[in-house]
Structure formats: C-alpha cells, structure tokens
Amino acid sequence: MSKLRFRVVETAFKKKAVEVATPAERPSEYFAKYVFNQEKKFKYIPSKVYNALIDAIDNGAPLDRSIADEVAAGMKNWAIDMGVTHYTHWFAPLTEGTAEKHDAFVEHDGKGGMMEEFTGKLLVQQEPDASSFPNGGIRNTFEARGYSAWDPSSPAFIVDDTLCIPTVFIAYTGEALDYKAPLLKALRAVDKAAVDVCRYFNPEVKKVVAYLGWEQEYFLVDEGLYAARPDLLMTGRTLMGHDSAKNQQLEDHYFGAIPTRVAAFMKDLEIEALKLGIPVKTRHNEVAPNQFELAPIFEECNLANDHNLLIMSLMRKVSRRHGFRVLLHEKPFKGVNGSGKHNNWSLGTDTGILLMGPGKTPEDNLRFVTFVVNTLMAVYHHNGLLKASISSATNAHRLGANEAPPAIISSFLGKQLSQVLDHIENSTKDDLISLSGKQGMKLDIPHIPELLIDNTDRNRTSPFAFTGNRFEFRAVGSEANCASAMIALNSAVADQLVKFKKDVDALIEKGEPKVSAILEIIRGYIKECKAIHFDGNGYSDEWKKEAARRGLDCETSVPVIFDNYLKPETIAMFEATGVMTKKELEARNEVKWETYTKKIQIEARVLGDLAMNHIIPVATQYQTDLINNVYKMQSLFPAEKAAKLSAKNLELIEEIADRTAFIKEHVDAMIEARKVANKIESKREKAIAYHDTIVPALEEIRYHIDKLELIVDNQMWTLPKYRELLFVR
C-alpha cells in the first residue's frame, strides 16, 4: 500500500494539462446552446402558445394544461434536432443532490416499427417511486406514489443525449418532497409582500424578483491521490492527516497564478457551463492550497439555484476528464480553510429598481431603508431558523473555525449604513419630516453615496453582511443546496413585510400621513432588531458572550439547531406565507436528523476500518523495526552504551504502544457507543447521541493517528499525506 502512495504521487507529478479546444464562436454566441430558452421556444412553439407560456413565466398567469401538448412537441422537436434520444424529469430531492430517471422518446407506432413521441402529459408529470427518496415518513414504502411536475419558469436543457426538464417533486397527497416546491412558494410569497410595500413608493410596481448570486468554493485533488485515500472516497473529507509544514500561512495562494492543469479544467468547465446557460463570470485561487472559486452573474433565485446544482454536477464530471476529483465538502482538510458558498441575495422590481440599493433622493432612500430594516427584522426574529437552514454534519466543521462566519447569525451593516439607521432612530418624527414650500414634504434622511456599493466595509467574520446593494449570506456550505437558505430567508422576509404593511396601514387609518407612518414604524423596528446588528469580530469569545446576552441563538449542536424548524413561530411563519405546512416541516426535520446520523455513522465506520487495517498495522510494523534495532544495538555495544544509543528508539516504541492501544480501545468503545445509539427510536435523540458521543470520539482517535503519522517511517505510511494532497497539482 505504501508503494501505491509513492506511485500515485509520481504519476500525478508527471501529468500534463489536458488540451481544451477553444470554440470557434464567441462565448456570447454559444451561450445557452443547449437550453430551451425564449429564442428556441419562439422558434419551435406556435406563437399563441408561446405568448401564453411567457405570460405564465413572467407574470404568474395560470398555465392552461391544454397547451402542454404543443409545448412538449416543440421541446421534443428541438431536442431531436440537437441529437437527443432521451428525456428526464430533473429534480432536487431531500438528499441535497439531484435525481433523474431517463426515458427514451421512442414508442411503438402500431405498425411494427418505432416513432419518437413526447406528449404534454409526459412533460407535465411523471411518477417516480417516492418511497426510495428521503421523505420523513410522509410516504410509506407500500404507498410509493410521488409525482414530479414541470417547472416552466426554469428552462429545459440538454446534457449528453438527454433532455432535462426541471421539476418539483411532491407526494401524491400534495406534500413537497424536494427543495424546489417550497422555494417557488417562498419566492411567490416575497414577491407579493414586497409588491404591496413597494406601492407605498411607486404604484406602478407589479412584480418583485428575488435574486441570487452564489460563489462556489471547492478543492481539486489529483484522482490518483484521491483513490488512495479511502476516507476522501467514502466521506468527502480526510478523517486523519497531520498538518503540512506549509499550508496557507504564507498567504500566497489567494488570487495567485492558477496552476496549468487547474486552468485547463476551469476553461473546460466554463465552456460547458456557458453552453448550458450558466453565466459564469469569475474564477480564482482561494485561500487554501488547491482551493478555488467559481462565481456567476446573479440571476433570478430559482434559476440561479438550478444552475448551482447543475454546476456542481458539471464540476464532478469535468474534473475527471482532467485527472482530478472535485471536493465540495465544507471541510475536506483540517488546519486549512474550508469551503463555503456565499449567497448574495437581493430584491428587484419590474420597474428596474434594486430594493437593497441606495437611491438618489431622500424618498428613494426611505424605500431603501424600509427594505433593509425589514430584512434585519426578519433575520432577528428568525436567526435560529436561518442558522438551521445552513446547518449540517459537514458545515459544522467549518462554521466558527476562525476561517468562516461563526455559528451565531448576526448582520454587519458597515459604518455608513449604521450611521443612517442611528440617525433615524435618534431623531424625532418632526426632525425627520418638515414641510418645504411647493415641494411638499422634505425628508431628513442622510445622503447615501453611490460609492457605498463598491466601498462597503468588509467584515469576513459576519454571516449575514450588507455589501452595498445586497445582503451576503456567508454561512451557506459549499456542498449545500442553496434552496434551503433561500427558502428560510425569503419566507421570513415575506412574513415580515406583511407585518410591516399591516403596522403602517394601521397608523394611516388613524390619520397619520403615509411617509410619517412609515418612518414611525421603521424607527420602532430599528430599536427592536438592534440585537442582530454587529460590526465587530465574530470570532471573539467576547462576541459569543455578548450574543447570548442579546438573546441570539448560540446553540452549536447541529441536531438541536434543527429544532428551530419546529418552533411555534417558525411553523406560524411558514404556514402564514403558504410555503410549508407543519407536517412538511416535521417530515423535513426527520430527514435532517436521519441524514446527520448516517453521515457521522459512515465517518465512524471508515475511521474505524482505517485505524485497524492501515494505521495500527503500519505503526506496529515500524515499532517492530525499532525493536529489532534495539536488540541489534544491545548485541553490538556494551549495555550502558547500548542503552544510551537506544533511548530515543525505546521512547518511540513506548509511544507507539501507548497510541495504538488508545486507538484500539477507543475504536472498540466507539463501536459500542454506535450500538447503543442505534437502538434509540427517535431520530432526533439518535442524532443527538451521535453528536454527543461519536463526534468527540472521532476527534480523539484522529489526534493519536496524526501523532503516529509524525513518528512512523515515511516510506511505510500508506495514505497520501497533506503535503501531497494539497500541493501536487
């Protein structure tokens, strides 16, 4: 096995960059080549049907099912013209990946031959086996029916020879079994609530769109080295491995020159992404060795989320063409930065106004402050839920590790915006509003320079930061489905905007002028949600104590954090917005607890196997060599000199004995602890047991394995070391 390690290292060093052919067309010409976008819809669908479809997508008009046959025919004809032979309903079950079942277009023609067919019924709905996906008890195995239903707002696309149709996935009783269905409901809720508030400022607003711009971080590891690390293969992270002498301390990797093999991978990935309509924009080295980032131009939230799921799938596929494996785990390597997926979120109107962007007049800035403060109120009242939306067994390794946002949700605003809110809070209504001749009402809201958009203070320790014209939710994990965070955030903001309008309307009904009523409520909100505003160092122990004093959620146990989904205020919020029912929330938590348990369980099994089958045998073999050396010393030298010359080896022999004994004892104890935990029927209590007993055991065992790595002869060590995994490109 040690020979395998050195062989794969040698092979990796010899690998050259894969040549990637540059398309003859410009990127703008091959962009969305494999997407059934508006241009293709216009070409392949009758104009009347096309107009109805676009109206449904853009304005939420009901889509008559009778037009589905003509849409399906146009979609099929385009796909066949592109060489496609199969189709699939592409959806995102609660596994956090994507799922698909491929069917061919061919059907019997009744004359002994075959024909290509794709009907509206097949476009609109399919019936996969719902019992085979996580469902939290909503579906029994003998009640397997679940449906995937077409989402016309996200265009179909082609991967290889298959037409992929984005869909939602629901139980036959109507409960959502995926991420897309509640995301669409959350986006609809925030659209309606935001439009109602926007009409205080502009009665012409008819639609508000939530935008998402994600920043995907990832590691690349040579596939030979990856294959020689069973822990990476099975869990996505290294369960053992001592720090490399050099890691990221020189700060020479971030924005550094991109390695040649990696640059070829990035080029290949970008070409594939652009052809699938993913507007990739930025690529660069990240902080840790062999860590990189990809970011697109922001898009409508549902489409952006589909594109992120698709890009993660593409990354896995394209990386193999280049002799790499992509690691999307939030913390594949201990001692260097983990990977996140910052979610840049904002709201925009159909009239072209970015609601999180400052305006040019005091009235515009009142609208801006209105939406910012309502967002802060939503984050304040649901800070535990937002934390639960990004929590997982994998992201827990990253959050709060002095490299990523802490596991306490707070919001950074920066100096300028903080001063504006302080001014409003500390001013009276008469101070803020004065009559100004023919111009009517004058607002004393400080000017917010446009420079703010590019010059907002940067605070990397904040999990939810205002960055000029948007909020950046930085706590989202690199492996996560963005929908989880976006469902929670958009639902909470929608619920808060509804409450805001109700509060303002109540004052207006009492005779208060509209602007005065808005300011009165905003001033109260600024005071109420002050606890969520924190511009300091989120890594400090002082902040943890201060956050607790402020009443923010400071829980660190992931299974307990999930309880936030079932708090009465959370259930009330999701039901009020029509996003999810109590039954759906309960089912999702069952899935979350079960998934957490299974991931820790797999890690425990893998670590136990590696400890017993790799680490202890290698350490014992080296120990035997040391013992033989001591015996030979004793046969060659007088006793006193032999003892002196062998003293260090005797210390190593004893240390190896102690550490291997500790590892064996604690692996056995961990197995027994798993047996005890596995008997617990409650999924919540079982997950808590795994968190409280198995997770600490993994760290204790790892500590001694990593110490052995420093002792054992490098030639004997079977597993690729961090210096090889992180610096061989």
Identify what each model region corresponds to:
Residues S2-A24, T141-F157, T162:
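N-terminal hydrophobic targeting/anchoring segments and the immediately downstream early-domain regions
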Residues F13-E19, P23-G120, V124-N140:
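Histidine/acidic residue-rich metal-binding segments in metalloenzymes
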Residues I67-V71, F91-P93, K121-L122, F169, ...:
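Active-site-proximal loop/turn and secondary-structure-junction residues that shape catalytic pockets
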Residues I80, V84, T88-W90, H307-R321, ...:
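Hydrophobic/aromatic-rich, well-ordered segments within soluble, folded domains that form packed cores
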Residues E96-G113, S131, R229, G236-T238, ...:
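Short linear, low-complexity motifs centered on an aromatic residue
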Residues E143-L328, N337-G340, L347-E590:
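Glycine-rich, acidic/polar active-site loops that bind/position phosphate-bearing ligands
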Residues L233, N308, E330-K331, G357-T361, ...:
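Composition- and surface-driven signal marking solvent-exposed, interaction-prone regions
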Residues Y525-R729:
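C-terminal amphipathic alpha-helical interaction region
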